[in-house]
Each structure stands twice: as structure tokens, then as C-alpha cells.
A protein has these predicted regions:
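Cyclic nucleotide-binding regulatory module and flanking cytosolic helices
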Residues: 1-31, 71, 76, 81-85
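Glycine- and acidic-residue-biased ligand/ion/polar-headgroup-sensing regions
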Residues: 33, 44-57, 72-74
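Short phosphate-coordinating micro-motif centered on Lys-Gly-acidic
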Residues: 36-41
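Short alpha-helix-to-loop micro-motif enriched in aromatics/charged/Gly
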Residues: 61-68
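Cyclic-nucleotide recognition modules
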Residues: 69-125
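Polybasic "coupling" helices that flank or enter modular domains
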Residues: 97, 115-180
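Phosphate-/nucleic-acid-contacting segments
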Residues: 147, 156-219
Length: 219
């Protein structure tokens, strides 16, 4: 599929605006683990995922990571272009969780079109509101939801994303997603194993009882 099939307001642009984007559009292939955007040091531009998976996260003062949200096929990220929106000062890092093909609209190009096009401006505001809603939901989870429920939710989300109950993932990776410490996650997973919910092996977690994990995350 072409870029115009992925950009929701493409048909709302005039011919000159379409040409401006097409002439400046960057196509990029990134390997798993590549950092695409690194906080306010970068003004990468608007990212649109053609295929693959990206992770957007923040770093605490102590260097702990916590995942804000993930980006999948046809998802767009505006926080990588937050420099064009003066009211937003949000330092995020974006890295590829899988090999990813993406498009980048340079920040200044998008900023100019956003000023000219009401549909693009409206779409941008809606997308930003959605992302901040995701972040607020995450904050609520961290503040009010116990770690066992958050780990259960994460494992179930991973099985849905990967399409398998045999997850290739480390305890450190889970800790980074949840803003916790590896040792704490290890203790929790060992507890889950003792309860017959999962089976642990080096670099792998097998989900044995999804129904009980679902019950745990809802309790």
C-alpha cells in the first residue's frame, strides 16, 4: 500500500500540499532495537508505521524506563514531532521493538500543512488527545493497580500481540515496560509459576492459564 492509503486525511489535502508531502517524505527501514527518536534532542517529525512495531517510553531520573504506548501497522506518532507544538514539552524515546518500515514527514513540512489545513489540524488535535488519554490511563494503572495485576495484563497483551502463549521475553524487558525493577518482576513471575499460571525458562515465558490471568487482572 502507498502512503496515501495510510494517512487518514490525505484526501482532504489540496494538490500542492500532497506534492509537498510526497517530495519530502522519508522512507526508512529500522532494525529491532534502533532508537528512532530521543527526547527533546530530536525533532524527528511525524512517524507513520507501514509495518512493524515501535515502543514509546520515558526515562525516570534514576534511569528506569516505562512504556507509554506502542505503535503498530498504520499507527501514527506525533510526540516525535512535539517540537512543532509549543505547548507540548514531553521527552519521550521511541525505539523499534521489531524490524520496522516507516514513513517520516519532516516536522517543518507537517507544521506548515497543519497551519494551512483545518482537517489536518483537527486530526492532529484528535490524535494528540488520544495519546494523552492513553498516558493518563497508564498513570492511573501505576498509581492504583497492584503489580500482580499489571504483570498479568502485560502478559495477556503480549500473547495477543505475538499470537502465541510461548513468549520470548526477558524479565528485564517486562520491568522496562512497567517501570519496575527486574528483581521485582522475577519474584512476581516465580510466584505466578508457583500458582501454575506460567512456566519460566531462559528468555521465555509460557502462559499456562490465560483464564486465571484474566481473572487476576480484573480483580
Amino acid at each position: 500500500m502507498n502512503f496515501d492509503n495510510y494517512f487518514p486525511v490525505w484526501n482532504e489535502l489540496n494538490t500542492a500540499q500532497k506534492k509537498l508531502i510526497s517530495d519530502n517524505l522519508i522512507t526508512q527501514h529500522v532494525k529491532k532495537g534502533t532508537v528512532i527518536h530521543n527526547g527533546n534532542l530530536d525533532c524527528t517529525g511525524l512517524l507513520l508505521v507501514k509495518s512493524g512495531q515501535l515502543r514509546t517510553y520515558i526515562l525516570s531520573d534514576e534511569g528506569r524506563e516505562i512504556t507509554l504506548y506502542r505503535l503498530f501497522d498504520m499507527d501514527m506518532c506525533l510526540l516525535s514531532a512535539s517540537c512543532i507544538m509549543r505547548s507540548i514539552q514531553f521527552e519521550v524515546t521511541i525505539e523499534a521493538e521489531k524490524d520496522t518500515d516507516l514513513w517520516i514527514i519532516p516536522a517543518e513540512i507537517y507544521k506548515g500543512i497543519m497551519k494551512e489545513s483545518a482537517p489536518v489540524a483537527n486530526y492532529t488535535n484528535e490524535l494528540m488527545a488520544t495519546r494523552f488519554s492513553d498516558v493518563m490511563w497508564l498513570i492511573e494503572q501505576i498509581m492504583w493497580k497492584s503489580l500482580d495485576k499489571r504483570v498479568a495484563s502485560f502478559l495477556l497483551e503480549e500473547t495477543s500481540i505475538e499470537g502465541t502463549n510461548e513468549l520470548k521475553i526477558t524479565h528485564e524487558t517486562i520491568a522496562n515496560h512497567l517501570g519496575s525493577h527486574r528483581e521485582v518482576i522475577t519474584r512476581m513471575l516465580r510466584y505466578f509459576q508457583g500458582e501454575g499460571l506460567v512456566r519460566l525458562s531462559r528468555g521465555k515465558i509460557a502462559i499456562l492459564d490465560s483464564k486465571r490471568l484474566e481473572t487476576l487482572q480484573r480483580s
